Amino acid sequence: GEPLPLDTCFILRAGTDVSLVSWGAMIADCLVAADALAEEGVSCEVIDVATLNLLDRTTILASVEKTGRAVIVEEAPRHVGFGAEIAALLAEQGLFSLRAPVRRVAGYDTIMPLPRLEKHYMPSSVDVATAARELMEFD
């Protein structure tokens, strides 16, 4: 196959209401949440950031300009995670595109637990869908 570019986000699902921005393991939960929200009439754009270094700011900003809402989803702790960097990007360069506050769905501010407890630590598709629904209340 072809090597993946290191500076490109991938739009896995096009949408018009909410941008779900994520990477790694949380992509699957974002896609599940997008399916559930579609049944409620909410159209989610799912963006796979893919590489955190050489961040594709253009794709993220264009998506949020289109949807006006962003949920950043990561499995890392909420504070000092890379999601905060994306939130800062939206505050600095995409503020006037936002119709609602940026929401971050992340792990707890603690160390990653043992595997048997991981499901209690990691955000879920339900958490992602809940955050997106809350953003839809802004208009």
Language-model regions, residue ranges each:
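Thiamine diphosphate
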Residues: 1-139
